[in-house]
């Protein structure tokens, strides 16, 4: 927690400067894809999301870890992330021109409506605790208003003594880590004072281990969450947290047992992690076709492409031979699973 994917990507840009372009792009893309999943590790094991998009992973991942199923939860998350990334890459290869054209038509009004819809999802996820959910949403919106207004450079709700340090308001990642970490510390401290901690037997009984039966009936959930993540990734500035929340809400709406989500079931974990990695291919679509980064990490990727001699505008059209370096790596993974995807 606290170290982002964009930090790792920025470090690799300087390290891979002298590498062959295929090796450099494959290395950077690998860190980008895997880094998105890595936020789930702390989210599952200690209930602190490593990335903003891992918020919903804590809903079911941590309850599974508390039952002694942490390893199973991590393996479900890894496989779900792989499927989500694979589907988003298929969309990247097949629908880049179409999705890029649609993304360009999204103005500030449409983006506002998407964020507003994401906020209304709070109501759907707060059944039984509506007042608490609405208050949390209102507090989040109020906090986001703090900082400098870009239209007229006026400060909003910023004390005079903090103007130099709060021009951009509160950064999302430190706020999330602080809120989740502090809450978890108080919870652990309270439980430690009330209960005696017994020694836990590390042996597995076989019921808590991972198997592909965990994905029985999850096909629609996998595809739906991947497509949600891909589409949200195409829209610059929307973010992975909105994608994971929307995917989780849809999984809950279409679930046969929605009351179980949030108690530690694979269905919620699959929706969250699939949409997270579905975001990676979607964020690359406007980058490769229009030179517009979909998120902060793809903004760093533009620098990597330029250092490798690739133009930052209309990348796929003018430099397909250099971008080939990102494709064979994925095909090697596909071949290990017994299939491959052809591309020009």
Model-identified regions with their sequence ranges:
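Helix-loop-helix hairpins and the membrane-proximal interhelical loops
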Residues: 1-24, 97-100, 104, 159-265
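Transmembrane alpha-helix interface/packing and boundary motifs in multi-pass membrane proteins
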Residues: 1-5, 35-47, 122-127, 226-238, ...
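Membrane-embedded alpha-helical modules
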Residues: 74-193, 307-324, 328-335, 344
């Amino acid at each position: 927690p606290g170290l982002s994917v964009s930090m790792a990507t920025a470090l690799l840009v300087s390290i891979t400067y002298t590498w062959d372009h295929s090796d450099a792009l494959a290395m950077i893309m690998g860190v980008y894809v895997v880094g998105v999943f890595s936020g789930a590790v702390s989210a599952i094991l200690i209930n602190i999301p490593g990335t903003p998009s891992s918020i919903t992973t804590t809903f079911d991942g941590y309850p599974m870890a508390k039952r002694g199923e942490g390893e199973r939860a991590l393996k479900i998350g890894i496989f779900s992330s792989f499927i989500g990334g694979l589907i988003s890459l298929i969309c990247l290869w097949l629908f880049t021109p179409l999705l890029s054209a649609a993304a360009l038509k999204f103005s500030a009004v449409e983006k506002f409506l998407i964020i507003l819809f994401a906020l209304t999802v709070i109501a759907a996820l707060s059944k039984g605790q509506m007042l608490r959910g609405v208050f949390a949403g209102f507090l989040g919106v109020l906090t986001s208003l703090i900082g400098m207004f870009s239209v007229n450079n006026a400060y909003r709700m910023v004390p005079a003594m903090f103007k130099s340090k709060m021009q951009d308001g509160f950064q999302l990642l430190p706020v999330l880590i602080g809120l989740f970490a502090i809450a978890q510390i108080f919870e652990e401290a309270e439980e430690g004072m009330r209960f005696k901690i017994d020694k836990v037997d590390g042996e597995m009984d076989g019921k808590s281990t991972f198997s592909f039966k965990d994905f029985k009936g999850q096909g629609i959930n996998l595809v739906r969450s991947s497509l949600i993540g891909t589409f949200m990734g195409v829209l610059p500035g929307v973010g992975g947290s909105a994608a994971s929340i929307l995917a989780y809400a849809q999984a809950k709406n279409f679930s046969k047992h929605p009351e179980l989500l949030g108690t530690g079931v694979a269905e919620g974990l699959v929706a969250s992690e699939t949409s997270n990695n579905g975001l990676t291919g979607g964020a690359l679509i406007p980058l490769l076709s229009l030179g517009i980064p979909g998120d902060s990490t793809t903004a760093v990727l533009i620098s990597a492409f330029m250092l490798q001699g690739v133009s930052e505008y209309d990348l796929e059209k003018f430099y397909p031979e250099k971008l080939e370096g990102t494709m064979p790596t994925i095909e090697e993974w596909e071949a290990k699973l017994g299939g491959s995807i052809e591309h020009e």
